[in-house]
């Protein structure tokens, strides 16, 4: 790994790790704060710097960008995006990866599983930590974590499992119960034991594991202790019948006594190092500090008068998301459906 790559990875880990800290400038080399990245000028300068390092360090990326454009970009908007399918065909990394995370895909190259070669786990932890602390652990002093996401010691190539491991390391987490096995599935008895305690529970789960838990509990109720909250992520991936999100949350409220305001949806992809959340556990929209979600400004649209405020996913300020025309990759106006293009500075 070149010194340029090592340097930029270290700087990004310091910068992103400072998000939400009292003193965001934690190193002399950091001349901007995470909040500055909400402004296009600061975001653009850092994006172009990362692009230059990647172009210099990865011949495959250099050939791709030369073939797609050829011109030196003057703005991050001019950098040709990497298609998701590329993660199934070639390793996209600058230097030697510390970890390789794999998707759960079932078709395509290399067995259909995309691979994200991550050069720095410190960067991944720094990227994830401020975000999940803001949205899942705000106001928490002590909590028990019950994970229906696999233990990262058991499933080593899952970015989601690794993030669950990061959360388990937080000082507020008094105990962690790994209640999902890739072979046997959800450990309902472990969830029952957690419900009998007095500490509030942070339940981390995929959507299909949550449905399996509710199905196993049947018509019975298993109220979690007051202050409990749930992070739900992912779709159903064909493992269970699709369930309307509103109906699922109502069922959770009836069975686990966790209201909608304490159920937070996390949006992530193996191909991205950053995550988006649609609310703060305990009430409130996704953190206002996460302003980089939609470069076009269409955060789900404006609510009609008298209607509830829509819950919209927000990334941290080092991510921009654009809706592009699938045929031309030209940006679309606000409100138009298109191909989502995430520009994540953590994908260095």
Regions found by a protein language model. Name each.
Residues 2-19, 41-53, 142-144, 151, ...:
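Active-site glycine/GP-rich loop and adjacent strand/helix microenvironment
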Residues 114-157, 161-174:
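Long, hydrophobic, well-ordered secondary-structure blocks that form the structural core
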């Amino acid at each position: 790994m070149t010194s340029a790559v090592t340097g930029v990875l270290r700087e990004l880990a310091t910068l992103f790790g400072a998000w939400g800290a009292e003193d965001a400038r934690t190193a002399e080399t950091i001349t901007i704060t995470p909040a500055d990245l909400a402004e296009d000028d600061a975001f653009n300068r850092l994006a172009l710097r990362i692009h230059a390092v990647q172009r210099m360090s990865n011949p495959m990326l250099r050939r791709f960008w030369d073939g797609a454009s050829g011109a030196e970009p003057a703005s991050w908007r001019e950098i040709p995006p990497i298609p998701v399918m590329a993660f199934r065909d070639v390793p996209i990394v600058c230097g030697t990866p510390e970890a390789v995370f794999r998707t759960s895909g079932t078709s395509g190259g290399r067995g259909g599983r995309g691979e994200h070669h991550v050069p720095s786990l410190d960067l991944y932890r720094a990227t994830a930590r401020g975000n999940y602390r803001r949205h899942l652990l705000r106001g928490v002093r002590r909590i028990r974590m019950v994970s229906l996401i696999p233990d990262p010691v058991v499933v080593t190539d899952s970015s989601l499992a690794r993030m669950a491991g990061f959360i388990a390391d937080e000082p507020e987490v008094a105990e962690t119960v790994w209640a999902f096995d890739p072979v046997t599935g959800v450990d309902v008895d472990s969830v029952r034991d957690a419900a009998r305690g007095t500490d509030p529970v942070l339940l981390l789960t995929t959507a299909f594991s949550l449905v399996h838990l509710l199905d196993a509990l049947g018509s019975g109720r298993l109220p979690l202790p007051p202050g409990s909250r749930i992070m739900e992520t992912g779709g159903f991936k064909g493992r269970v019948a699709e369930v309307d999100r509103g109906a699922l949350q109502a069922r959770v409220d009836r069975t686990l006594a966790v209201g909608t305001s304490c159920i937070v949806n996390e949006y992530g992809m193996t191909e991205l190092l950053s995550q988006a959340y649609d609310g703060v556990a305990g009430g409130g929209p996704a953190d206002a500090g996460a302003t980089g979600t939609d470069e076009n400004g269409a955060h789900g649209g404006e609510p009609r008068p008298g209607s509830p405020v829509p819950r919209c996913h927000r990334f941290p300020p080092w991510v921009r998301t654009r809706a592009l025309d699938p045929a031309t990759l030209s940006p679309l106006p606000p409100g138009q459906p298109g191909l989502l293009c995430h520009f994540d500075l953590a994908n260095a």
